[in-house]
A protein has these predicted regions:
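Active-site SXXK
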Residues: 81-98, 117
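Active-site-adjacent helix/loop patches that line small-molecule binding or acyl-intermediate pockets
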Residues: 2, 14-41, 103-213, 220, ...
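Short acidic-glycine loop/turn motifs at beta-strand connectors
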Residues: 64-68, 96, 221, 284-290
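Short Gly/Pro-enriched turn/cap motifs at secondary-structure boundaries
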Residues: 50-53, 156, 269-273
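Short glycine-rich loop/turn motifs
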Residues: 56-61, 192, 277-280
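Structured C-terminal helix/loop/strand segments within mature extracytoplasmic catalytic/sensor domains
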Residues: 232-373
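Penicillin-binding protein/beta-lactamase superfamily catalytic region
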Residues: 203-250, 281
Length: 373
């Protein structure tokens, strides 16, 4: 059988839709949007086997005190905010959804696992007659235990709570709910107004894309995302976003999820929210940062819960917040690259181990192994 790689397998050249394909598998180069090796990623975590660097996790970290970026380690990297921005999407509906229960408020900003409690909370936001309006993709639970769910449903999707809350908010505002996921809808305009509260009225994104759940997501630098997250601290008592996440951390993510674990460790002083493809946003109330501290982590190759966990533990640790290590490594040892924190914290960073007493030391023999000549 002959295969012609010059012809599209799905749409033949000249047919409607064929122009949507890229011109090259190498991708196009757009001025002002770095790609590939031109993206200014920095090393964040180094996995070493008996002292030799075996795997290095690259990414970007930015710290913002109020509107000021105070530390950037790859902070100029351009990315999409993805689900990390759900608290700001829901800020457009804080008045309309003010009378919801705390569980309903928490699920509205969640990227949940799809457990029974998550689905029940999301479904409670709408009457059953409104369920067909929801446009989340069909999915199965993100994490499953015991009996496996094999039939995809919209409610299992990790963003179902957000979509249900948006639909309810649109109803309360009197907005047409048809097309609520489109960038031409009032939902997106309201979201952009929230972003401009923190970045300025003249700010415009370089790109608007469709997120995995169908809602629009816009491009920001990691430093801009940190500035936006610092705003969560300033808004802490102005709406219900902060308190709902602190009250019900397991609804925000779920069992052993990084953001849920950070919310518990912070004991009310930290908001954490994961985003797809390697994002973690932290809003921290800290006496050294009266204007609010926003920190955002982006992993270059996409979501890596373990590496992001090490970075988050180190960052929170230098600020006096104790986050446990991730579950033990059974291969290499993880080491933190010091650039993830400002220089003033380097001495403290050296006191935060990336290992625990019970971790097996399986990457070496406990005697000198030499080759015989």
């Amino acid at each position: 059988m002959n295969i012609n790689h010059h012809e599209h397998s799905a749409v033949k050249p000249g047919r409607p839709g064929s122009e949507l394909f890229p011109n090259s598998p190498l991708g196009e180069q757009v001025e002002g949007i770095p790609t590939g090796r031109d993206v200014a990623w920095e090393p964040l975590v180094d996995y070493r086997r008996n002292g030799v660097s075996e795997t290095t996790i690259h990414g970007a970290v930015a710290w913002a005190h109020g509107d000021e970026v105070i530390h950037s380690f790859g902070g100029n990297v351009l990315c999409y905010g993805r689900s990390m921005m759900k608290p700001f999407m829901l800020k457009a509906f804080v008045e309309e959804l003010a009378n919801l229960s705390w569980e309903q408020k928490a699920i509205s900003v969640a990227s949940h696992n799809g457990d029974t409690e998550h689905v029940a909370a999301a479904q409670s936001l709408l009457s059953e007659s409104e369920w067909p309006l929801m446009l989340t993709p069909l999915d199965v639970p993100l994490i499953q235990f015991g009996r496996q769910v094999r039939r995809p449903r919209r409610w299992y999707h990790t963003c179902s709570g957000e979509h249900a809350a948006i639909l309810r908010g649109c109803r309360e505002k009197g907005w047409n709910r048809a097309g609520y996921t489109l960038p031409s809808h009032q939902v997106f305009d309201a979201y952009m107004s929230q972003i401009r509260r923190f970045l300025g009225e003249d700010w415009k994104p370089l790109r608007i894309a469709k997120d995995g759940c169908g809602l629009p997501t816009v491009s920001n630098t990691v430093a801009e995302l940190a500035q936006i997250y610092a705003g969560l601290v300033r808004d802490k008592d102005a709406d219900w976003i902060w308190e709902s996440m602190v009250r019900h951390p397991d609804l925000v993510g779920g069992f052993n999820r990084l953001d849920s674990t950070i919310l518990k460790a912070g004991e009310g002083t930290v908001i954490a929210k994961e985003g797809a493809d390697g994002l973690l946003g932290l809003a921290i109330e800290h006496p050294d940062y009266p204007k609010g501290l926003g920190i955002v982590v982006k992993i270059a190759h996409g979501w890596n819960a373990q590496a992001t966990w090490y970075v988050a533990r180190a960052i929170l640790g230098v600020l006096g917040i104790d986050l446990r290590n991730p579950y033990p490594l059974h291969r290499q040892k993880a080491f933190i690259v010091p650039g993830i924190v400002p220089d003033r914290y380097l001495n403290v960073l050296e006191t935060i181990p990336t290992w625990d007493e019970w971790d097996p030391d399986q990457d070496r023999w406990m005697y000198d192994a030499e080759l015989e000549s």
